[in-house]
Curated annotation (Swiss-Prot):
SUPFAM superfamilies: HydB/Nqo4-like (SSF56762). Belongs to the complex I 49 kDa subunit family. This is NADH-quinone oxidoreductase subunit D. The lineage of its organism: Bacteria, Pseudomonadati, Pseudomonadota, Gammaproteobacteria, Thiotrichales. Keywords: Cell inner membrane, Cell membrane, Membrane, NAD, Quinone, Translocase, Transport, Ubiquinone. One of its GO terms (molecular function) is NADH:ubiquinone reductase (non-electrogenic) activity. It comes from Francisella tularensis subsp. holarctica (strain LVS). Its main location: membrane. NDH-1 shuttles electrons from NADH, via FMN and iron-sulfur (Fe-S) centers, to quinones in the respiratory chain. The immediate electron acceptor for the enzyme in this species is believed to be ubiquinone. Couples the redox reaction to proton translocation (for every two electrons transferred, four hydrogen ions are translocated across the cytoplasmic membrane), and thus conserves the redox energy in a proton gradient. Gene3D superfamilies: Cytochrome-c3 Hydrogenase, chain B. It catalyses: a quinone + NADH + 5 H(+)(in) = a quinol + NAD(+) + 4 H(+)(out). Its EC number is 7.1.1.-. NDH-1 is composed of 14 different subunits. Subunits NuoB, C, D, E, F, and G constitute the peripheral sector of the complex. It is a peripheral membrane protein. It is found in: Cell inner membrane.
Length: 417
């Protein structure tokens, strides 16, 4: 009798469902996955080592490029680690602005996730719906920083500047008619806070549309229910965090369990799943977007009623005012030295973890008292999830592989660093 051998298949790194540069070596028995061996490192750029050769305030831009779809959430952990090292006090208004943008970033991440997951599983309409909404939030990024993705808006001690009193306006182009531009600009006539008041109302309707398309869709449930199941105990043993852990029924969220910034003053719930499968992870992320929308609304209301400073008055980290630099040579010298040499910190080591859209994103800094870290280490949430790929895929069909990879929500900018 002929001997049967398992088939070895390379999945990725150039595959539309690989979500970046994931390379999986799959061992197949027919169409059943017997073993999955993930290979990482194809997007390694040496970010940690680069940051160890630059002053603290010159590495904020690197953080945006780690998980490049959750930009400000990466910045958030990094600047909080520096503040902990320097024992900096952050103005209350800056804390609310940070939380508001962190929740906007969570929505941006989850919208991209549901869009990409929809395409992977054959539901392309969701992609178009989600990207339409993402443009509104990118407008907010652009309004505060001038950049639509890599904002570098957070600073040790606060944020770069206060919220703008007007939003960017759409212009008539080859692709945007005058009538369409006028309609798009209607909610953008006031300040950013006015625009966000419109957004939180419209976003609920957009989520309802996605819910209608997917949640009770027979084909969607066939592709996700009982696929990639992980029990609560096993999820904890594997080091899962974020929606991967909460999808298995564990109510662990650093915003609640280890509150930072102003999360302890805000009201929100922690959505959890029951079965730990792909479908539960989808439901958790959809519910998280609704909770983030509530948090944005609470921040908008507080910010409207409480004007104030958005950056620490500690001159060690805060640049001088523009008017002062025009009239005072010492202020100009201080500005030059701050942005060329940076500032020295006390000796010591700190770790700060934040609730990133994909899980716990942590920054560890060891300082020897210089103006740059002696050692910078980052905890990428996706690395633990990728490490469990063999367990998640084994026993499933090859066609289930895109669904499982997609609901892990991995981006290799932070995994490979």
């Amino acid at each position: 009798m002929a001997e049967y051998k398992n088939y070895t298949l390379n999945f990725g790194p150039v595959h539309p469902a690989a979500h970046g540069v994931l390379r999986l070596i799959l061992e197949l028995d027919g169409e059943n996955v017997v073993r999955a061996d993930p290979h990482v490192g194809l997007l390694h750029r040496g970010t940690e080592k680069l940051a160890e050769f630059k002053p603290y305030n010159q590495s904020i831009g690197y953080m945006d490029r780690l998980d490049y779809v959750s930009m400000m959430c990466n910045e958030h952990a990094y600047v909080m680690a520096i503040e902990k090292l320097l024992q900096l006090e952050v103005p209350e208004r800056a804390k609310y602005i940070r939380v508001m943008f962190a929740e906007m970033t969570r929505i941006l991440n989850h919208l991209l996730w549901v869009a990409a997951c929809g395409i992977d599983l054959g539901a392309m309409t969701v992609f178009l719906y989600a990207f339409r909404v993402r443009e509104d939030l990118f407008d907010c990024y652009e309004a505060v920083s001038g950049a639509r993705m890599h904002a570098a808006y957070f600073r040790p001690g606060g944020v770069a500047r206060d919220l703008p009193t007007q939003m960017p306006q759409y212009q008539k182009t080859r692709f945007t008619s005058k009538r369409k531009a006028k309609k798009l600009n209607e909610p953008r006539q006031g300040s950013m806070l006015d625009f966000l008041d419109h957004f939180v109302v419209d976003f609920e309707k957009s989520l309802d549309e996605i819910d209608t398309l997917l949640t009770d869709n027979r084909l969607w449930k066939q592709r996700t229910v009982d696929i990639g199941t992980v029990t609560a105990e096993r999820a904890k043993e594997l080091g899962f965090t974020g929606p991967m852990l909460r999808g298995s029924g564990v109510a662990w969220d650093l915003r609640k369990t280890q509150p930072y910034e102003v999360y302890h003053k805000l009201e929100f719930d922690i959505p959890i799943g029951a079965n730990g499968d792909c479908y539960d992870r989808y439901l958790v992320r959809m519910a998280e977007m609704r909770e983030s929308n509530k948090l944005i609304k609470q921040c908008v209301d507080w910010l409207r009623a409480n004007p104030g400073s958005v950056l620490s008055d500690n001159h060690k980290v805060a640049p001088p005012k523009r008017n002062a630099m025009k009239n005072n040579m010492e202020e100009l010298i201080h500005h030059f030295k701050l942005f060329s040499e940076g500032y020295c910190t006390t000796e010591g080591e700190v770790y700060v973890g934040t609730e990133h859209p994909k899980g716990e994103f942590g920054v560890y800094i060891k300082s020897d008292g210089a103006n740059k870290p002696y050692r910078l280490k980052m905890r990428a949430p996706g690395f633990a999830h990728i490490s469990a790929m063999d367990e998640l895929l084994s026993g499933h069909m090859l066609a289930d592989t895109p669904a499982i990879i997609s609901t892990i929500d991995v981006v290799f900018g932070d995994v490979d660093r």
